[in-house]
Design a protein with these regions (language model features):
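A short, proline-enriched helix->beta-strand linker immediately N-terminal to the Walker B motif
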Residues: 158-162, 191
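Catalytic Walker B motif of ABC-type/P-loop ATPase nucleotide-binding domains
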Residues: 164-167
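Conserved ABC ATPase signature
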Residues: 139-143, 147
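ABC ATPase NBD coupling module
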Residues: 19-22, 73-90, 188
Length: 239
């Protein structure tokens, strides 16, 4: 088995507002190997997005720890985790965020370690693969929500991160453009790991494995073919 790149041990996440205690995650222990395309699926409130945010260091768990190789999150400060995210992670959030005063290309090149002709050529390649080649010099105000999301996908890849974390990356896209994004993320496993949260099993048919979540607990890894088959025409999985 490939050595684990990212792992969790007994992760829990509890919200207590004084009136109610909510267990968002309960004792989640998983391993994600290097250079894999994996999905996290579950119904609303299952904890899948919370787990993604903890894996990426954007949220601290109530208990347990996350490790990236030998790097334990618990032993490091919030500033350390900011540096970790900048140096080793790429992000695609459900709601696209772009700097409104910069063109789509300028937003993508922000993710490049060196701004040179090679970086621009690389960015142009991503734009073409994502079907937004004609949008490179447009401002975000001139783009649709789906076009903005595809720009964010290109930006996430520009610095060749070890891991790309994507939270519902196809939610604002039609079927065809959703597949463009998924195909590009799937191909990225040649360079690094991709972790995708989605409600649509069809978007994970090319994944290496899918983690099913319910009520804040891990139900274990599944073969994407089995998950897609269980979903049927409704595109929902009974958990």
């Amino acid at each position: 088995m490939t050595e684990s790149l990212l792992s969790t041990t007994n992760i829990s996440l509890v919200y207590d507002d004084g009136a109610r205690v909510t267990h968002a995650l309960r004792d989640v222990t998983i391993e994600i190997p290097n250079k894999r395309f994996v999905g996290i699926m579950g119904p609303s409130g299952s904890g899948k997005s919370s787990l993604l945010y903890i894996l990426s260091g954007l949220k601290r768990p109530t208990g347990g720890d996350v490790r990236l190789g030998d790097y334990g999150y618990k032993a490091h400060s919030d500033l350390d985790l900011i540096d970790l995210r900048r140096q080793r992670f790429g992000f695609v959030f459900q709601q696209p965020y772009l700097l409104v005063w910069q063109t789509a290309m300028e937003n993508v090149l922000m993710g490049a370690p060196i701004l040179d002709a090679a970086a621009r050529k690389k960015a142009v390649g991503y734009f073409e693969q994502l079907g937004i080649g004609a949008m490179a010099e447009k401002l975000p105000s001139q783009l649709s929500g789906g076009e903005k999301q595809r720009v964010c996908v290109a930006r996430a890849m520009m610095n060749d991160p070890d891991i790309i974390f994507a939270d519902e990356p196809t939610a604002s896209l039609d079927h065809a453009n959703g597949h463009l994004v998924v195909d590009l993320l799937s191909a990225y496993r040649k360079h690094g790991t991709v972790v995708v949260v989605t409600h649509d099993p069809e978007m994970l048919q090319g994944a290496d494995s899918v983690l099913l979540m319910r009520d804040g607990q891990s139900l274990g890894w599944r073969d994407p073919v089995d998950v897609l088959g269980a979903a049927g025409p409704s595109k929902t999985v009974a958990l």
